[in-house]
């Protein structure tokens, strides 16, 4: 395994359209790609073209693929594949290919907050060789694991489980200011 991080509890704040913040007392490793990149990318319809694709069943949900291509050649996102339920209008999988971090696949599971389109679980699969770690964590790993060479196709998994959602409660912009 690349790194096994103990389970961490965190508070995640999100405010439309592009404000995102994580507060955690321990180590919380989140993929930069996927959490807010797709939301920001999709917020401007002039920045991409979308093409309807194949039907595919994901975890017993019938979905349709929408391939999203940037119109800006300098976009960090090269391709976004979004699998959306045909009956619920929920995303069940996204596959983001980026210039700097390779491919990140995200599977979504829903329960109580399904009506808001908010998942209770997200499972990220990342390219280990291209995944960007925080510098302090990456430094420790490199010092402890100098002999390990990661293959081009080696994958890592990050699982986020969400609970205690507070929806539409209003968040001050001050929450998102850097300390």
Residue ranges and their predicted role:
Residues 62-174:
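Gly/Pro-enriched, hydrophobic low-complexity segments
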Residues 3-90, 98-102, 176-178:
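Flexible, processing/modification-adjacent segments and terminal tails
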Residues 2-3, 151:
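Short consensus segments that form the blades of beta-propeller domains
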